[in-house]
Amino acid sequence: MIPVHLYDSRSKQLLEVGMDENKKTYLYVCGPTVYNHAHIGNARPLMVFDTLRRTLKACGYDVIFISNYTDVDDKIIQAAKKEQISEYELTSKYIQAYEKLRKDLNVLLPDYTPKVTENMDKIIDFIKELVQNKFAYVVDGDVYFRVSKIKEYGEISNRNIEDLKVGARIEENEKKENPLDFTLWKKTTEGIQWDSPWSKGRPGWHTECVVMISNLTPHTHVQIHGGGMDLKFPHHENEQAQAYAYCHHPLADIWMHNGMININHEKMSKSLNNFILAKDLIATYGGNVLRWIMNSTHYRAPINFSDEVFNNAISELNKVYTPLKQANLKLQVESSISFPLSIDEEKYDLFLKALADDLNTSLAISILFEELKKLNMTLRQKTIDFKVLAKSLNTCNHMLSILGMEEVNTIFTEEEKNLYHQWNDFKKNQMYEQADQLRKELIKKGIL
């Protein structure tokens, strides 16, 4: 087993990823509020935490991955009105779109994808307990969390509580005892509502994740809690506060946050009208290009998207996949090597150790390129050592798999192999017109 260390926003230190008493490692990532298609900022955590999950598994961890759907929200109500469909129809539509996005980006399905609407009874019971224990209070059918009861408040975002109060007063609510107190239950007559001891209404966003973690983990606790940097405050801070109130311990051992997205060196925002939907980028460039860009930058650093970044990614991917495809083809049409193949354990171990050091994907990619250099040298030999070539190809495929990238392992049919041999014969016999036509067909079939 290779121990994995990750940067914890709470302690500002690299911490070793642990396990519970059953040797399980729980990873929870805040999922989308499903009222629209995901933009590229929403897609970054999808890819980052998929790479983390693959890394943990490869390093010997038994990972339980949970990522929720927020299918109750004011934005959902407004979007449903705009599209003139029910809230259920709207959320179903965008959950389906998100699942397609996950597939297009080669992201593994979570072990659990809980929805808020499926956990309403548990959410109400959770809030009841907080009210009973004086961690929450009721005002005119609304329920608020009493932040003053949590001495650790501000520890995830590393903010001073007095400074937070000053900022919170800008949007002060006269119902609250404290400007920092946040909504656990909202009384409303708009949109879908649920009966509760306090009013007809719906839950606050910050409560939903805590309850879903409580429902799916043994002790309302995960080893890693992930999300975008923008969720540190108030969302993750408020989740943590409720965990202290409910079970008297932190919600997570490690709070892991990925960096934000810039478009042409400007922050992506609705006001600048520079939002880019992930599905549109995939339609233009493909999911593999997006994953390469994400893997080329450390997960905590911001990523700048521009035409130059995409062009560089395409160029680098050509350097990766052209020799791999050549190797795969030669192994099948010119050798008798059988699958599955062995790998270079030493090189693969170095690759995993790079990722185990706070998901250092840049270093991991440099190790991938070292193996590609070896593969290229083998391809250029007058007499190819097919065992060495096969081992190198398989090692690269293993590395690409951990990065969530496409592997090169197509098995060609006898008919396809014969077409390749026919193309070579045309070239040898200087039948260039026929060779050119057949080459186009081989490219179309993905053989060349």
Language-model region placement:
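The substrate-binding groove and active-site-proximal loops of carbohydrate-active enzymes
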Residues: 81-86, 111-117, 199, 228
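N-terminal, positively charged nucleic-acid-binding surface of large information/translation enzymes
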Residues: 11-16, 20-106
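Structural preference for alpha-helix termini/caps and helix-kink/transition segments
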Residues: 267-269, 275-448
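Short, glycine/charge-rich beta-strand/loop segments that flank catalytic centers
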Residues: 69-73, 95-98, 108-123, 141-150
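Alpha-helical recognition segments enriched in aromatics with Gly/Pro capping
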Residues: 1-33, 50, 121-327
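Short phosphate-binding/catalytic loops that engage adenosine nucleotides
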Residues: 61, 135, 447
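Alpha-helix C-terminal capping/helix-coil junction sites
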Residues: 57, 103, 131-132, 256, ...
